[in-house]
């Protein structure tokens, strides 16, 4: 695992940035073991991101802190730990891909429990709990409420008055 600890994801790269220029920028922070700029298979052009692996994980941390948000070849780059970015950043990635938007919002705070209950009760709990209380009131609040009050109310009133008259 020490290999992954020293590995950084570098995103937002200029398409002209080469592995050599990236190594030059990052080698200030320590011994670089490997630099990879990910390229498109057919066009061989940079896809705008890559990986820099340091011999020492501490150097990688220093580089990440120092270089995140900095400009390289005229583009602001994003630097993250390679192993962690997919887990931390897309925390709900697994749940999100199979569970859809609503589930992702609800399942975020639950972690494992949300994933486990995906097909079961917590899915419906999220739907009714999340959608009913916040969905209909907050999100649709004005239009839904006024629509229901005006036409629903007047319709009901007139309907009730017909029933009581007869």
From Swiss-Prot:
Cellular component per GO, a single term: nucleoplasm
Biased composition regions of type Gly residues, renumbered to the chain: 93-120
Gene Ontology molecular functions: enzyme binding; mRNA 3'-UTR binding; mRNA binding; ribosome binding
Post-translational modification: Methylated on arginine residues within RGG motifs. Methylation by prmt1 promotes cytoplasmic accumulation.
Compositionally biased residues, Low complexity: 121-166
Annotated localization: Nucleus, Nucleoplasm; Cytoplasm
Domain RRM stretches: 6-84
InterPro entries: Nucleotide-bd_a/b_plait_sf, RBD_domain_sf, RBM, RBM3/CIRBP_RRM, RRM_dom, RRM_dom_euk
Domain notes: The glycine-rich domain, which contains a number of RGG motifs, is necessary to regulate nucleocytoplasmic localization.
Protein name as annotated: Cold-inducible RNA-binding protein
